[in-house]
Amino acid sequence: WYLIGYGGDEPLIRQKITEAGMQERVIILGKKNNPYPYMRACDLYVQPSRYEGKAVTVREAQLLGKPVVITNYATSASQLEDGADGVIVPMDNAGCAAGIAALLRDPARMPQLSENCVKRDYLNSAAVEKFYALME
């Protein structure tokens, strides 16, 4: 697993990785000016947030045809269609881990999610039309 990004919890995350003996399996890459090569190479994109407005990185992963797992934060249902172009998992650690594990154990599901991402139109035109309709 590769973690891209940075934040105040990094020391705690490093500690948890060490406590679990996962230093060889979980690599913290830190901030990347160009994360797209990593996203393109990944099998799965996970956004384990407690809150998000509109997570641009979720959409970027979908545009790259990657299955996406996000936690059930307040706006998660607006980010993806659960089971169609991604999966929404519980926000707690155990529920999130169980949701990821279930997806990884299902060999047919990840390719189907990827295919759905590739087929879906993620352009902003539909959102812009809704916005203009609100002003009428």
What spans do the regions from the language model cover?
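Nucleotide-activated donor-binding/catalytic signature segment of Leloir-type glycosyltransferases, i.e.
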Residues: 14-30
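Short acidic/histidine- and often glycine-rich active-site loop of Leloir-type glycosyltransferases
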Residues: 60, 73-83, 87-88
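Short hydrophobic beta-strand element within catalytic cores of glycosyltransferases
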Residues: 67-71
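Conserved acidic donor-binding segment of nucleotide-sugar-dependent glycosyltransferases
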Residues: 82-83, 87-93, 102-107
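A short, well-ordered alpha-helix in the C-terminal region of glycosyltransferases
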Residues: 109-123
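C-terminal alpha-helical cap of glycosyltransferases
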Residues: 124-136
